[in-house]
Amino acid sequence: MSSGESHQEQLSQSDPSPSPNSCSSFELIDMDASSSYEPVSPHWFYCKVLDSKELWIPFNSEDSQQLEDAYGSGKDCNERIVPTDGGRYDVHLGERMRYAVYWDELPSEVRRCTWFYKGDKDNKYVPYSESFSQVLEDTYMLAVTLDEWKKKIESPNREIIVLHNPKLMVHYQPIAGSDEWGSTSTEQGRPRSVKRGVENIPVDIHCGEPLQIDHLVFVVHGIGPACDLRFRSIVQCVNDFRSVSLNLLQTHFKKAQENEQIGRVEFLPVNWHSPLHSTGVDIDLQRITLPSINRLRHFTNDTILDVFFYNSPTYCQTIVDTVASEMNRIYTLFLQRNPDFKGGVSIAGHSLGSLILFDILTNQKNSIGDIDSEKGSLSSAEDRGDASTLEEDLKKLQLSEFVTVFEKEKVDREALALCTDRDLQEMGIPLGPRKKILNHFSARKNSVSINRPAMSASEVNISKENGDYLDVGIGQVSVKYPRLNYKPEIFFAFGSPIGMFLTVRGLRRIDPNYKFPTCKGFFNIYHPFDPVAYRIEPMVAPGIEFEPMLIPHHKGRKRMHLELREGLTRMSMDLKNNLLGSLRMAWKSFTRGPYPALQASETAEETEAEPESSSEKSNEANTEEPPVEVKEEAPISVGMLNGGQRIDYVLQEKPIESFNEYLFALQSHLCYWESEDTVLLVLKEIYQTQGVFLDQPLQ
């Protein structure tokens, strides 16, 4: 073997790779290049316009996968409608639009996103259009396959995207376009980062909501179109409330979720402000509004006047009709979209919305249709015992001879209660009988002032022909209350002025035996600094002074500043009691007369001081024992409005809020939407009706 041949063999052994000139060499290069390219994984986004700015929000992972499956299903994909966001929105694939299902909302644009660029004024990434994203993807595939980079792509709006390498891709926005001679300026603005695939951009993508819905809650807003200090709508605030509930289910009902006992609670908003102000009343108000302090007057017309609208017979009817019809409509639509739903329904109201729901609930009828025949009707025991006919009433008044007159005029007992002195005179009733009749029904109204609080806070007579018409004599307007298509299980009131409105209407107390005709539970939840909130329990038990139930912190125990405050209070009380006891003993010994012998006086003082000190100790012990006895042995009776349970529940203020109550007053009235403590109480009470409890009871 020659030296040249041996050298060639060594080269071949040391470098086993094929020669670049061979055909197999090209095939290997193409295989390596093509294998390094992987198609991009798309993710679906929708666009929300907030403050005239477009914000692209990703669908959760489950919804995005459903949209992608529908997109790749075939030719009919453009006709597909995919429910998203727990069934609250529908995406029309052909239109690439997202529509709200249960409420009115402007549709949102939907995109199948693969390529993104960083926005101008923030660090949020904006997706390219689907068509241009496909151009970028094709160019990227060629660059990776052929290993040829620094490719320039011009977008439809004449912007330049440069692919330097897989890690560096930039977007240039030209400062000036072509001039009048057709020449194009080469000056470019600040480059913006370009990313391929949603996994390469900073964005939070949630896993999605459980498919199983255990309970449905309707949420009614208060005055005005805005529900918090950020001027957000009821839809946005309820979205926050729902998000908090999903997080709390994972942290406080983890065992039940792992055992697949529970799914989630659906919260749906009910809007009555827009239908009310679409009646043309805003135009009428604008004509009489003074031109000065325009913004303040506009705010007043749009918000505070809602309270006066509710006290107007015309607009009160519009409000209750809107709330009831909206809840019935949404409930029917919800059942159509969720045919397997077997859970219960509850309602929640914030501020004035809670009063609207309170009045609607008190004017419902049970399934039999006769409220007075059911246990727990609005009438008191005295009123139920006096549920006589018109003939019996006239017989008691010794006016039986006028029965035929009333029958001829088709006046029944309820209609007679509505008659005035002039009406009776026109029917030919003499002055004496007229006074007897009017005095009789006036006395009945005054005697029933407590037993029908929910019936618009006054004595209410229910017509036999139409049980929804109310005769109200102490301030509440007379309207026809619609019937709900379901029986709510629990009524939650957030920051509610119900107690104040009932008092203003002339109601001083609530019958302890009263309960809603169709609703079993009632929780009055409020922040201690909320200027709009009022208590309910003192109206049920006016002779007893007691504190509301303190809502536990969602992380357990009380807030540290509250525990510290209670500890200091107890310490000061102990010091005060000890000091007073010492001063009392010294004063008694000082005012006691002198004894003949010093020793005798000392022994006498000792013998008297011992029972006194023991009595002081026993008194101190007695002063410390009653709170324990009240909590354990003597539960407070607050009537049947909440099934015998407590009604008033107060939140714990935050440490910073305790420094100045007035500074946080307005915020306290709007804090419920994002309050974990409020949401956890709602979830706890709802799931208790299903036999599901917290993983660990809160203290």
From Swiss-Prot:
It comes from Mus musculus (Mouse). Residues 1-25, 599-635 are annotated as: Disordered. The gene is Ddhd2. Pfam families: DDHD, SAM_1, WWE, WWE_3. Changing residue 351 to A: Loss of TAG hydrolase activity. Diacylglycerol (DAG) and triacylglycerol (TAG) lipase that is required for proper lipid homeostasis in the central nervous system. It cooperates with PNPLA2/ATGL in neuronal TAG catabolism and hydrolyzes sn-1,3-DAG downstream of PNPLA2/ATGL. In vitro, also acts as a phospholipase that hydrolyzes preferentially phosphatidic acids, including 1,2-dioleoyl-sn-phosphatidic acid, phosphatidylcholine and phosphatidylethanolamine. This is Triacylglycerol hydrolase DDHD2. Its EC number is 3.1.1.3, 3.1.1.-. Forms homooligomers and, to a much smaller extent, heterooligomers with DDHD1. Residues 30-112 form the WWE domain. SAM and DDHD domains together are required for phospholipid binding. Residues 1-11 have a biased composition (Polar residues).
